[in-house]
């Protein structure tokens, strides 16, 4: 049995693991997916103190490298349930793990478009990560769906790889940073489509075109950047207090269930940023340590 099990290895999970290990706790991490979480989807990170500019994938690598240096047990398994009790149980598709405390850092996942045949084309023209899959569309026509910073960053990244990049925006304007908007407007191979929604996706085995409310556009790739939603599948049996599917925590990062903590993008808060996720992971681990030692 462990002192604490951390679920997830994004920024908050890595931070929690580092602080737990350094405080002397017997800690293990369970993660399913890429270490670093959604940091990997950022083409460039420029707002993390001490690092002027770095790619998201490089920052994720650095965080994971720090984690690995501490020899913390890592189980690459998918968590399917958490069972409360004096001893907490974390159930994966392969094993059952026990701990005194649990820190949930499962983060968020990209929102889907919610249109017919979307799942059919995932990996066959639909992607939710430009930096992960952009190179598959070199010299091809693609579209970005979304009007915020992540969509603009993805469009800039793809404009250097793809022949033409359409930006499909539901509203009549962008809601991103002015510097990003200006950079987009200076790109000759970027076409902006305001007041536009995708109504259908067409193609036999792979994406060949999209039908919008205005026209049909021939393209090979659709990159969806319309925001994120919390990953809550593992929470079904915990009866946690929630707010719009986000976990409510107190100042110590403890949930409404004693001994269950949460940090990062899975919790209800005002600011969803890398720097806040790292802080919350540290706070959660520190308070787990205090609780166990008391």
Predicted regions span which residues?
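A Rossmann-like FAD-binding core segment of flavoenzymes
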Residues: 67-91, 96-99, 160-251, 292-294
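Phosphate-coordination loops involved in phosphoryl transfer and adenosine-cofactor binding
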Residues: 1-3, 76-77, 138-140, 195, ...
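FAD-site-proximal beta/loop scaffold in flavoenzymes
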Residues: 114, 120-136, 226-276, 280-290
